[in-house]
């Protein structure tokens, strides 16, 4: 099958990639955003991982069709400003082997003329939840993912916030509990929220993954304290209409009520916010890939 992108006498499709630190999700969608097929596979080294994504699109595009646009939501930090020379590159990431990786070239080499739009994975997830998820009909909200790392996307007045780079919410410093002697998982900052409350931090601190820790484990008291502190900071600085907490760690159903209660205690109900102010995603694990499709549209 030819990989050259042409539109004459061909049906056109959109491509989407959610590139996380541990797994990659790829999808092919109609121009209206309906997903036709998708797959997931582990994040390995850049060359083999990106080539596997290229092969997915080459193998699964319908016959006599073309891929005209690709949206990529990637772990970061990443170059997301098209005006800068580092657009589409992974920057100072702790993910071994990925610093300097170019996310654009493997796809433009395989599909000449392909339009590619790149943003962070959390910004893509924020877009997805805004379309038909937990932030539908809202114009200002924050999406936080708590997985291997921690990141956040901020939407204010229906616009994703970007500046010099993109928000690095995972590297906000928080107060470390006196009882917590853990030195932190982040190689850059000892007491940032990613260093103290990410999935990697849970594993390093307790020797088990989050999904293997029972609800009564002391990890959750500490985890909810740190995440409630983060929500308090975001509320004070951004005043969003809602905070959405996603990612693998938040799939533990007992965690959200703990965070909500600790947030109320810490804030002393100062903001008088609705009960659904802090919630989990409505799109579940599909938030990011749906947002990546939106990037391609």
What do these predicted ranges mean?
Residues 163, 167-179:
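Mobile, glycine-enriched helix-loop/loop "lid" segments at the mouths of ligand-binding/catalytic clefts
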Residues 84-99:
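A charged helix-plus-loop insertion that forms the helical arch/lid used to bind
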């Amino acid at each position: 099958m030819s990989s050259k992108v042409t539109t004459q006498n061909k049906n056109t499709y959109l491509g989407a990639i959610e590139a996380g630190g541990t797994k990659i999700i790829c999808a092919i969608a109609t121009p209206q955003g309906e997903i036709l097929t998708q797959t997931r596979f582990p994040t390995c080294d850049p060359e083999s991982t990106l080539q596997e994504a290229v092969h997915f699109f080459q193998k699964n595009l319908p016959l006599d069709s073309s891929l005209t646009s690709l949206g990529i939501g990637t772990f970061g930090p990443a170059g997301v400003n098209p005006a800068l020379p580092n657009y589409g590159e992974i920057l100072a990431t702790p993910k071994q082997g990925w610093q300097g990786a170019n996310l654009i070239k493997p796809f433009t080499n395989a599909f000449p003329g392909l339009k590619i739009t790149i943003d962070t994975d959390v910004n893509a997830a924020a877009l997805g939840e805004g379309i038909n998820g937990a932030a539908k009909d809202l114009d200002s909200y924050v999406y936080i993912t708590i997985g291997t790392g921690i990141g956040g996307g901020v939407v204010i007045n229906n616009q994703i916030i970007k500046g010099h780079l993109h928000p690095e919410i995972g590297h906000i410093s928080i107060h470390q509990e006196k009882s917590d002697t853990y030195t932190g998982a982040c190689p850059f900052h000892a007491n940032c929220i990613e260093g103290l409350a990410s999935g990697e931090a849970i594993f390093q601190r307790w020797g088990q993954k989050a999904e293997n820790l029972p609800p009564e484990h002391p990890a959750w008291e500490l985890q909810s304290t740190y995440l409630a502190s983060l929500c308090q900071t975001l509320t004070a600085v951004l005043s969003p209409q809602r905070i959405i907490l996603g990612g693998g760690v938040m799939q533990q159903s007992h965690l959200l009520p703990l965070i909500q209660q600790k947030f109320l205690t810490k804030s002393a109900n100062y903001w008088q916010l609705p009960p659904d102010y802090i919630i989990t995603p409505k799109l579940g694990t599909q938030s990011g890939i749906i947002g990546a499709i939106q990037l391609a549209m």
